[in-house]
Amino acid sequence: MEQRKQCFNCHNQGLPIMALTTARSRGFEIDGDHLQAQLQFTADFLGRNKEKYREGNGQGGQVDTAGYALWTLDNGGWKPDGTTAAVAEYFLLRQKDSEHYRPESRRPPSEQSHFTSSYVALRGLKVFGLPEQKERIDARVEQVRQWLLKTKPEDTEDRVFRLRALQLVE
């Protein structure tokens, strides 16, 4: 893990923060300073790529990494800012000619499902999209919704994230 300390999700921050914030919401005591440091690390990770996001480019892991990062920030109570707005713009530009979001590689169990990629991107748009992006967000959500309704899941991950995504778009 020490060798990967600059990497975001699977090496250090995303899923552990989800576990910490879930534990806190259920009454467990957690180290709040540590949680804030991890949230700041995540925000800084995204911030280093802000200009790339505005141009429709991202970082390694593309939609999955950016989507999990925004999900992480939301779980920690992070408020929308210039960086999260840039990531929302990225979701509007990236794969815009596709009817859904696709992972950039096949690395199960964390990066394989088109349903997961679509969910994390839609979630990021819904939580961190700006009012001036609303029309484009609504159009993209409808585009992905149509894909979700007609596409059959192949495995458990697909089923789970298809259901989660359908909740977002209905």
What residue ranges belong to the model's regions?
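Preference for long, amphipathic alpha-helical scaffolds in soluble/luminal domains
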Residues: 1-170
